[in-house]
Amino acid sequence: MINMTETKQLKLILIGDVNVGKTSILHRLIFSKFTEEYKSTIGADFLSKTFYQNDIITHIQLWDTAGQEKYWCLTSAFWRTSDAVILVFDISNESSFRNLNFWYKQFKSKSINPDGTEKQLPILLLANKSDSLTRAVDQSEINQWCTDHKVNLYYEVSAKSSINIKESILKLVEVIIEQDKDSDNEQFNDSPDEETSSITLLGTSKKHDNTNPNKPSTSSPSSCFNCK
């Protein structure tokens, strides 16, 4: 009997202030390494990674974008082909948290379907540098921001210490796939009264990427809280 494995292609976009660690997060996920050397991203670039989980092969494009407004050049057409957005801030830098409102408005204004309706992208919020001795943002403020902006996925991560990097991305991929299934079921049943299930994420875990049960392959370079 032939085992048919499903294949998914996903495009994820990282946005946030300069120097919050977007590039470091990608390098930790893709190459399992961290460097102290800082180089600002200009425009946008991407890295690719393939994961296998739950009998699904998922090819992911992770887009690293500039954290400076003058380099913000992502068009509506770019966002139409996106499957999710990853908002990143530095938990030791309060201004990077305050500026989440700017980045949220930016991608919301660009995420427009061809028919003019707003594209409802899943959002993952990452508080990077969770291993920092200085915490500048109170947890209650983060929870309130998540509630105000209807963000259900939030992780505290560290690219330097490899905390929750892989776990957070895999959870986002899981949510995207589940939403796709729900959408397909709604279209198949064609029932306006059908109830859709909500996903509740609870708990914090600080596992390191070296515990790798899925053995994901790299293709080409180019503390979860329930926010209610």
Curated annotation (Swiss-Prot):
Record GO terms (molecular function): GTP binding; GTPase activity
Positions annotated to bind GTP: 16-23, 64-68, 128-131
InterPro entries: P-loop_NTPase, Small_GTP-bd, Small_GTPase
Statement: the UniProt record of this protein carries the keyword Cytoplasm: no
Sequence motif Effector region, residues: 38-46
Gene3D superfamilies: P-loop containing nucleotide triphosphate hydrolases (3.40.50.300)
Keyword annotations: GTP-binding, Lipoprotein, Nucleotide-binding, Prenylation
UniProt feature, compositional bias: Low complexity: 211-228
Compositionally biased intervals (Acidic residues): 185-196
Lipidated sites in chain (S-geranylgeranyl cysteine): C224
GO biological process: vesicle-mediated transport
Disordered: annotated span: 183-228
Superkingdom in the source lineage: Eukaryota
Family: Belongs to the small GTPase superfamily. Rab family.
NCBIfam families: small_GTP
Name the UniProt record assigns to this protein: Ras-related protein Rab-32D
Protein's organism: Dictyostelium discoideum
Lineage: Eukaryota, Amoebozoa, Evosea, Eumycetozoa, Dictyostelia
Gene behind the chain: rab32D
